């Protein structure tokens, strides 16, 4: 015997890809974490225009807005560890306050378009749930992109 034990605790609960703003999606929704990674790989930080011509439920454009604002992922969700008694609620509040203090205010040129009016309606609703409805412009766009 080696007298070893491994103790693992789930501090998070639901995965971080569940940001909480996408109650409704469309066919082939993109996970929020993957959308955020795509935006970060594009090196978008809010200074240049951002365009998603096939926006679907708006996940990529919404993540672009959250990144431009420097919004902490998961700020609007709860974590399993918050129910543990040995971490005071004030510690969670302080962490949230610190994250909010690091957010940027600004005007960003973020646009999402889709041929499907229902998808655009869902994208607008998701942007509102994410708190970025004033930062992202969604339009039904039937123009050919070819």
Model segments located where?
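Glycine-rich, flexible loop/turn motifs
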Residues: 12, 17, 26, 71, ...
């Amino acid at each position: 015997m080696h007298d070893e034990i491994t103790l693992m605790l789930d501090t998070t609960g639901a995965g971080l890809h569940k940001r909480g703003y996408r109650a409704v999606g469309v066919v082939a929704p993109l996970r929020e974490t993957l959308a955020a990674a795509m935006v970060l790989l594009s090196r978008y930080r809010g200074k240049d225009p951002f365009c998603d011509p096939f926006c679907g439920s708006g996940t990529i454009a919404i993540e672009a807005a959250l990144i431009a604002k420097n919004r902490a992922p998961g700020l609007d969700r709860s974590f399993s560890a918050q129910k543990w008694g040995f971490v005071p609620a004030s510690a969670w509040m302080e962490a949230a306050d610190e994250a909010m203090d690091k957010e940027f205010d600004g005007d960003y040129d973020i646009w999402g378009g889709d041929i499907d009016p229902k998808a655009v309606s869902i994208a607008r609703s998701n942007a509102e749930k994410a708190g970025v409805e004033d930062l992202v412009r969604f339009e039904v766009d039937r123009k050919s992109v070819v």
